[in-house]
A protein has these predicted regions:
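Short alpha-helical transmembrane interface motifs in multi-pass membrane proteins
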Residues: 1, 66-73, 104-109, 148-152, ...
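Membrane-interface helix-loop junctions in multi-pass transport and translocation proteins
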Residues: 10-41, 207-210, 217-264, 276, ...
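Membrane-embedded alpha-helical segments of multi-pass transporters/permeases
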Residues: 13, 17-21, 41-46, 87, ...
């Protein structure tokens, strides 16, 4: 899954750069997306080159009816939720506010991309375990996925919150500094989404996409209702006056509240239908991250960071302090270290990619 997306995204990015440098206009930005999707489709098709194409039967259609239709319905609301924040800010505020929000949202989305990686790895594994009725293995897999993802994302989000202004100055510009609080909130949104994904995949991989789809639709509706309350100062058409008028911050809070609601609901549903309970590791990591964040906040008040390598160094120190405290508490073990070492080892990754490309069916 990753390789076609990497190739397609790389080609699309090169076209973006060429279009900007050569002044080709916005039409080439749209063409870049189209070309990228076509490239991804071609490479994805190549992966299925050894699979025969058979005539669909009633069993195939029934499986799509059970799984694909709920997911498709949820996807429609998901797209609406994805763009509703910018739409509401644009309607009730100005293009300037939309630009501030969109700019810092790009940074927060970098954290959220890990959710896609989790789904790509977990969904087939959980589906296979569910088919073989290995419920205990599913429980272990969900807990491990949440724990390992939290080990990476929690300190990353904590450092994003602490150094939000410096991140904006280094990667955007000082014009985006008014959106510092929005970046902090959206970083929390990304964290909640990533930590929710193992639980969502557990339900979908166990043949309950209907539950996650209904939850996605309800959360989209909740998010829109909250935006109507938090974003505008007033909606005279509806007779609503003296609203919160938080603008971009209100949109970010609306998304955060809806994602937290989704997270709580996913865990309740996972317990009810799969008998999977949350573990305490997550709460330990959150407490440690809060302590580290407070300490680094004091450091941030006393020093000036205005270069990218200084920013990476200070954030790295925060991450190292986070892991060190977990190590002292016994929440980070040699097994965890070996797991991350193998995951990040270029030699292991090269071997894995080579096996995928040269696999023998």
């Amino acid at each position: 899954v990753a390789i076609p997306n990497i190739i397609g995204t790389t080609i699309r990015s090169f076209i973006f750069i060429a279009a900007a440098l050569m002044g080709l206009g916005v039409i080439w930005l749209a063409r870049a997306y189209l070309i990228g999707i076509i490239v991804i489709g071609i490479f994805s098709y190549w992966y299925f080159r050894d699979f025969p194409i058979s005539k669909p039967d009633s069993q195939t259609f029934n499986s799509y009816k059970v799984y694909a239709l709920p997911v498709a319905a949820a996807s429609i609301f998901g797209v609406l939720k994805q763009y509703s924040d910018k739409i509401f800010i644009g309607i009730f505020w100005t293009e300037y506010q939309v630009g501030l929000y969109f700019g810092v949202q790009r940074i927060a989305l970098f954290i959220g991309t890990m959710a896609l990686a989790i789904e790509g790895m977990l969904l087939p594994a959980i589906s296979n375990l569910h088919a073989n009725k290995k419920e205990n293995e599913i429980r272990t897999l969900v807990h491990d996925a949440e724990r390992y993802v939290a080990l990476i994302c929690i300190p990353l989000v904590a450092m994003t919150i602490v150094w939000s202004s410096e991140i904006i100055l280094v990667f955007l510009s000082k014009e985006f500094l008014p959106a510092s609080n929005i970046l902090k909130i959206l970083a929390l949104v990304a964290l909640v989404r990533v930590l929710n994904r193992p639980w969502s995949v557990a339900l979908r991989g166990s043949d309950r996409p209907d539950l996650t789809s209904i939850l996605s639709i309800l959360s989209s509706i909740l998010s829109i209702i909250l935006m109507l309350i938090l974003v505008p100062k007033r909606i005279p058409q509806l007779g609503l006056e003296n609203l919160f008028g938080l603008g971009g911050e209100g949109a970010a809070y609306a998304v955060l509240i809806s994602e937290i609601t989704v997270g709580l609901s996913l865990r309740i549903l996972s317990y009810k239908y799969l008998e999977i309970l949350p573990k305490s590791n997550f709460f330990v990591q959150m407490i440690v991250a809060t302590m580290v964040g407070i300490f680094m906040w004091q450091v941030q008040e006393t020093i000036t960071v205005d270069r990218w390598f200084e920013l990476f160094f200070m954030s790295g120190l925060g991450g190292l302090l986070f892991l060190s405290i977990l190590l002292m508490l016994g929440s980070f073990t040699k097994k965890d270290f070996n797991f991350f070492w193998e995951t990040l080892n270029p030699k292991s990754m090269k071997q894995y990619v080579g096996e995928e490309l040269k696999r023998d069916r």
